Structures are given as structure tokens and as C-alpha cells.
Amino acid sequence: MLPSQSPAIFTVSRLNQTVRLLLEHEMGQVWISGEISNFTQPASGHWYFTLKDDTAQVRCAMFRNSNRRVTFRPQHGQQVLVRANITLYEPRGDYQIIVESMQPAGEGLLQQKYEQLKAKLQAECLFDQQYKKPLPSPAHCVGVITSKTGAALHDILHVLKRRDPSLPVIIYPTSVQGDDAPGQIVRAIELANQRNECDVLIVGRGGGSLEDLWSFNDERVARAIFASRIPVVSAVGHETDVTIADFVADLRAPTPSAAAEVVSRNQQELLRQVQSTRQRLEMAMDYYLANRTRRFTQIHHRLQQQHPQLRLARQQTMLERLQKRMSFALENQLKRTGQQQQRLTQRLNQQNPQPKIHRAQTRIQQLEYRLAETLRVQLSATRERFGNAVTHLEAVSPLSTLARGYSVTTATDGNVLKKVKQVKAGEMLTTRLEDGWIESEVKNIQPVKKSRKKVH
């Protein structure tokens, strides 16, 4: 039987570290609602507090770089919604949460719903650029979906009247705030698509709080805007207000007035462009006419100076002159060619190459014979001289001397030894005999005294 596996043994440090990693990796980031208590802010600028409900509580920390983005001062007993990461403070083993953002409970819940819906629709690709429809340029009719009593409608109509008074506008009045507003906005969008009277829609309202603008964060409104066959320009609130409708719409305008600017043409600017184009066209026509008139005058003058009858007469005279010159030149050329042919025929008859060829062949044969004889004599003499040189060379060759029993000894530097003083004891010598070399070492040096000859 296999021995049972021993249970893992943790140190306290390892246990706390393992629990912290499990909390951070498994739980991730969460939204938590609760009541603030025990709120403190030390000199470091960090916030420390407890978040609790009726039956439980948890310690919280919000570091300075995160709490600087909070737009209110947390109070004891205040209900809030926080976005936080769950962790464990390892030195004490305290379970706590690290808060990243904080909002009052009312706005916080709405913001949470906003983020959840935004993530959902984004996952469905409703915000993708590939689904955005281009706006008509220019628009022939504008539809406006907003409150008939709101300031947004007044701003839109004022801008359209100023920029393009002739542009038709169709108003689809609807409530933009309250529980019934999302349904009314959806029906207005669907009605505009059914009637198909306009080629662009402005959907929006004036500014307000998050609750006031909440109708444009409704999922039904977002899907109706996405499904609209008519391009939709969202114009909700002020430039800092961003709603779900802005992401789904084909174009977001920061304000209702800006939306009117986008869908309309500036009539005054168009008039200035037309006037400028007209002036350029008139200048171009004047220049063209003046240029054509000047060209016509030049051509007319040239026609007067070069009447066809006069030109034909001059051309006829020139043609006759050229014909005479050509006939004279042709006759002279034929005469010169005939004379040259006669001279060449005479020279050819006088200089028949056959005799020259015969003499040249005879001369070549003679030269060949003389060359062969000269080479034979020179080769014989050269052979004789070579034999004499070989005989002489063999007579004076050192090898012949070696063959008679003599030898040649050289030092290590290759010099031939003539006297004993050229070497020292212990040096290596090389001796050449008739049939090879001998390597030897100098053991002893004994000079031979020369005997003096007696003079009688």
C-alpha cells in the first residue's frame, strides 16, 4: 500500500500571502454599497474607514491618488457605493478592501447601472464604427426628437433659421425626463423611420443631473437609435455629459446647438462662396474672351498678309526652280559617274593581279627553302655548343670533386668551412659527400701549424 500523503504545512507568512493572492485573483474588482463609519484621514492624505450594513462590516482604505477624484467629503453614517479590490494586509492578517472610486449611494447606483449597460452594449458591438451611418451632405430635411417646451428645441430652431432658413424641419415632440420618457423617445424614433420624411434625426435635450438625463441611458432608447435607418445625431446635455445614446448614435454633438450646426449648411457662407465663384468665373470669361479676340486679330492679319493666291504663286515659282536644279544636278552626277567608271575600268585592266600572284608564290617558295636551311645550320651549331658546355661544366662541378673522395663541410649558417677558427666546440656541422649528408658535432679543435719553408 502507498503511504498516505502528508498534509501541506504553511508558515503564517505563507498562509497570509496565499490567502491574499486568492482574494485578489479570484474576487477581482467588485462594487460594494454600505454605510461609512470610523472615517479618518491622517497626514499622509489616505482615507481609512469602515463600511458596514445591519449585520456586518469591513475595513476600507482609499489612497490619496484615488480619493483626490472624489467630488464630496465622506461623512459618518453616509451611504455610498464604492468600486474596490479585495485584499489581505499580510503583517496583521487583516482582511480589507482597497477602494478605487466612491459615489453617493443614489448617483452611485445609477453610475453602476450606466457602466453595466455600457459594457453590455459594447460587447454586442453596438458602439463599433463600422455600424455608423454617414450624415447626408447636404441634408434636405431634419427631424428633431425632443421636448416641445424645452430650451433644446429653441436652440436647434434658432441655429437652423440662422444658418439655413430654407431647410425643412419636422418636430417629433416627446417627453425627455421621467419614467415614461424612454418609451416615448423610442416611439418617436420608430415613427420618424416609418414616415421617412427626413434624412437625419437630432435626438436630445438640454443639460441636467444624471437622474435628469437618465432616459438617454435607457437600453430601449439605445437599441432604437442603433436600429434607426435614418442617421441619428445625439445632442444630450452639455459637452461634459456623456450618455449611452452618445455611444450608439451615428454622431455625437456636444450640445443641441452644435447638432444643428452639424446637420445644416451655413447659408451666408454658401452665398459668399457662390459670389466668390461667380467673380472668379466672370474674370475667367473676360480673360478667355480677351485672349480669343487677340488671337482672332492675329490670325486675321496673317490671312491678309498671306493670301492663298499669293502663296500658291510663290510656291509654284519655287517648285519650278527646284525642278531645274534637280535636273541639272542629276545630269552632272550621271556624267561624273560615267567618267569615273571608265577610269576604273582602265586601271583594272592595267593592274591584273595574276602576274603579281605568280611572282609572289615563287618568292615564297625560295624564302621557305632558305629558312629551312638556315634553321638546320643554326640548330647543329647550337647542339655542338651545348655539348661542349656540358662537358666543361661537369669538369668544374663540385660534385665531380666529391666523386673523387673529397667532401664539403658547412656551418649552421650555411657558410663553407675553410679554417678551423670558423667553428667552436659543441657546434653542429653538415658535411656533403657524393651520396648524401652527415650531421656531426664538434668535440675538439686542433689547428695544424704551418711549417715555414727554408730559404736557401
Curated annotation (Swiss-Prot):
The protein's enzyme class: hydrolase
Recorded catalytic activity of this chain's protein: Exonucleolytic cleavage in either 5'- to 3'- or 3'- to 5'-direction to yield nucleoside 5'-phosphates
The entry's keywords: Cytoplasm, Exonuclease, Hydrolase, Nuclease
GO biological process: DNA catabolic process
Listed GO MF terms: exodeoxyribonuclease VII activity; nucleic acid binding
Primary localization class, coarse: cytoplasm
Subcellular localization, as worded in the UniProt entry: Cytoplasm
GO cellular component: cytoplasm; exodeoxyribonuclease VII complex
Source domain of life: Bacteria
EC number from the UniProt entry: 3.1.11.6
Subunit structure: Heterooligomer composed of large and small subunits.
Family the entry assigns: Belongs to the XseA family.
Job of this protein: Bidirectionally degrades single-stranded DNA into large acid-insoluble oligonucleotides, which are then degraded further into small acid-soluble oligonucleotides.
Name recorded for this polypeptide: Exodeoxyribonuclease 7 large subunit
